[in-house]
Amino acid sequence: MKGFIVFSLSLCLVFTVCLAEDELMKEAVRKFLKCVACAEPGSELRTEYHKCSELKPERLKATMKACCDETMPAGSDEDARWALVCADDGILTKVCDCVKAKLPMAEVTTAEMEQFSKYKECAKKLNEEKCK
């Protein structure tokens, strides 16, 4: 169960894709997530990304978990789900659509956005250090 939660939390960068209006930004986020997804299970990259994921607002974590449950195969573990994203990052679009439906931007609070910004900074640093 812990591994599943880690995976669900890790995909929260999808929220950035959902918010991004700039196609270059969306592509950069997708490349980063693919980098994390294709990393070896238990790797330093995935471990560090999990630490970043812990910085996200609780409501977003819950929404992402629900969306991963809806869009990923039932019973798949964290590594299997990462493998799906590695093989086809199009799954991120499905998760993003689910997040937008369940948590419209109009309902995201200023405090949640501030908390999410901490996560984005952590993920950005990790991307620059490990995925470029």
From Swiss-Prot:
Renumbered to this chain, the signal peptide range is 1-20
Q: How is it modified after translation?
A: Contains 5 disulfide bonds.
Disulfide bond as a keyword of this entry, yes or no, is yes
Q: Which UniProt keywords apply?
A: Disulfide bond, Ion channel impairing toxin, Secreted, Signal, Toxin
One function term, GO molecular function aspect: toxin activity
* Localisation per UniProt entry: Secreted
Chief localization:
secreted
Q: Which residues form the propeptide?
A: 21-30
Hey, what tissues is this thing expressed in? Expressed by the venom gland.
> Which GO terms of the cellular component aspect does the record hold?
extracellular region
Please explain the role this protein plays, according to its UniProt record: Probable ion channel inhibitor.
Q: What is this protein called?
A: U10-hexatoxin-Hi1a
Species lineage: Eukaryota, Metazoa, Ecdysozoa, Arthropoda, Chelicerata
